[in-house]
Amino acid sequence: MSFRFSLTHTDGAARAGTIATPHGVIETPAFMPVGTQGAVKALTPRMLEEAGAQVILGNTYHLWLRPGADLIARRGGLHRFNGWGRALLTDSGGFQVFSLADRRTLDEDGVSFRSHLDGSAKRLTPETAVDIQACLGSDIAMVLDECPPHPSPRDAIAASLALTTRWAARCQARLRRLQDGPVEGVVPTNAGQVQFGIVQGGVYPDLRLESAGQLVALDFAGYAIGGLSVGEPNEVMYEIVGGVAPALPAAKPRYLMGVGTPTDILEAVERGIDMFDCVMPTRNARNGQLFTRLGPLNIRNARFAEDDAPPDPECACYTCTHFSRAYLRHLHVAGEITGSILNSLHNVAFYLDTMRRIRQAISLGTFTEFKREFLSRLNQRADAS
């Protein structure tokens, strides 16, 4: 199955559709659980699929450093390596290089840095990022972009987005070269892999539109909005998304990277975004915070020690249909790994079910009403009831 995006319904700017990939169909709007090291923390592929996941995200930077892209390619690619049979998106590694790695040196050709694992010298270029992702065999690969910190001066952001555009063109050329025939040292594991461009431009609306226009001219399979949810006010993020989305082709998917909370997702869907990823469901779960339809629930709270109610009475996930708040609190307090598993399963199921309900509301033309009611209930506190 080749890559294809189809819109099925619209409701205002909100869109519902499907993305066909070599590893199955993704219904949009979609949330992608994050599998940083090739695994979504505390969850198996079977758990993810039973929870409704149709696509997950893998991290190029981490998988390149450990266990290595070549090793994964020799195993037949990331799908075979980690046992995930559905769609897979990989980021380019740029965000991690600019946020995790030590002693970075940036130039026109790429970025040199030292691994956060062992201090070894590494060099990431647009071509390297493409080669790594080709070896991983993701269905959707992201181009390498520069990720300047927030806040940054306008002139620095302008220079950064220009570099990101040049790198995007190099990424595109490299993928075409790999698809034309063998390249020594690179073993692609997914002939149907496509690339998404990444719109940058900081908090400057005109620079965002400039970046979008340059990337649209390169004609990628889809487009992401990067560099948001990095400390800017939510209202600024919503303004940027609302300005950029209409500048991207309606016939191609739009992906808001690293976002986010249920509220952020609803606001972005309302502005025309189709894809999301965030570590929040699993990270919060490991810290004892559960998402529910009546707001957040901190399972650490002592008042749940003898509470026999399910975490979320309206949730049909395995955790909520089999276990009580009292038991989950016990597991968390005891440091039992089963607690992280059950909490993570619930939070991921909550996100995926929220996306299902969003898609349904768009198809019925009731998204505005759904959003209003959902946020009204979500802004309560389940652990205060």
What are the functions of these language-model segments?
Residues 150-153, 158, 222-228, 337-340:
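Glycine- and acidic
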Residues 128, 132, 159-170, 210, ...:
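A non-catalytic, amphipathic alpha-helix used as a structural packing/dimerization or gating element
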Residues 24, 56, 91, 133, ...:
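Conserved, mostly hydrophobic/aromatic
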Residues 1-189, 302-305:
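Non-catalytic, usually N-terminal nucleic-acid engagement modules in DNA/RNA processing proteins
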Residues 174-186, 252, 358-370:
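Surface-exposed helix-capping loop/turn segments at secondary-structure junctions
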Residues 162-165, 174, 178-182, 190-311:
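Glycine-rich phosphate/ribose-binding loops and adjacent secondary-structure elements
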Residues 1-18, 26-30, 42, 145-151, ...:
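C-terminal extensions of enzymes
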Residues 54, 139, 221, 274, ...:
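Short acidic/polar active-site loop segments enriched in Thr and Asp
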